[in-house]
């Protein structure tokens, strides 16, 4: 699933490609992707004649701002936005097409069909689901060690489960939580309330640093991720633990292990990340 670094790179590349383009028509071949309004036909009619003004990101969501509305899109596992010419072949996994007046088309492709789109009037999007309950952005001033400390001390859930909760902070998924906890030297099954202030400080620093580095490297291409210009990321070359079960730890040489935490495959070093 694309996490914050991947979605941010999609945002940047997509904004360069489609800002200023006017939507002439919308073709939806898999209506279940459109969650709001309930009728995909209404979604299509509302967007006709709208011009894309800019594209923002909130956590793992893309926000496409047009003249009067905002399209809130979640890519889920395999979603991709790619720009095409009108005469190019249409991939069988293309489920939404935004046809522009200049003859180009923005295609939303999704092999798994898990992605979603919500359409809101401008100004309504942040106060309604799916954005209303999201926590702070990792790079915002609102996220501080003190913020994390106050919230982590109130829950006995395992720290990995807590960090995956987008209500605490946004953007972390399975890949980057494993990497953050390795850099923090925290076992993924530690109870959040057991963490010291110093350990929480390490988690904060590792979160900001890891995500920042991953954004600069274009994200991580583990399976099929590409940005909207068709480019892969390179941060996968710097991963320390994710997907590396059975390999030696880069720090101590111990063989890395994999377990399941909160239903998610979890990679860690049993020596560098002791379960106290």
UniProtKB/Swiss-Prot annotation:
GO biological process terms held by the UniProt record: base-excision repair
Zinc finger residue extent: FPG-type: 240-274
Record: residues binding DNA: 93, 112
Alphabetical list of CDD domains matching this protein: EcFpg-like_N (cd08966)
Domain of life of the source: Bacteria
Gene3D superfamilies assigned to the protein according to its UniProt record, in alphabetical order: 1.10.8.50, MutM-like, N-terminal
Cofactor binding annotation: Binds 1 zinc ion per subunit.
E.C. designation(s): 3.2.2.23, 4.2.99.18
Cofactor: Zn(2+)
Keywords: DNA damage, DNA repair, DNA-binding, Glycosidase, Hydrolase, Lyase, Metal-binding, Multifunctional enzyme, Zinc, Zinc-finger
Pfam families registered for this protein in UniProt: Fapy_DNA_glyco, H2TH, zf-FPG_IleRS
UniProt record similarity statement: Belongs to the FPG family.
Protein name: Formamidopyrimidine-DNA glycosylase
Naturally occurring in which organism (per UniProt): Bacillus anthracis
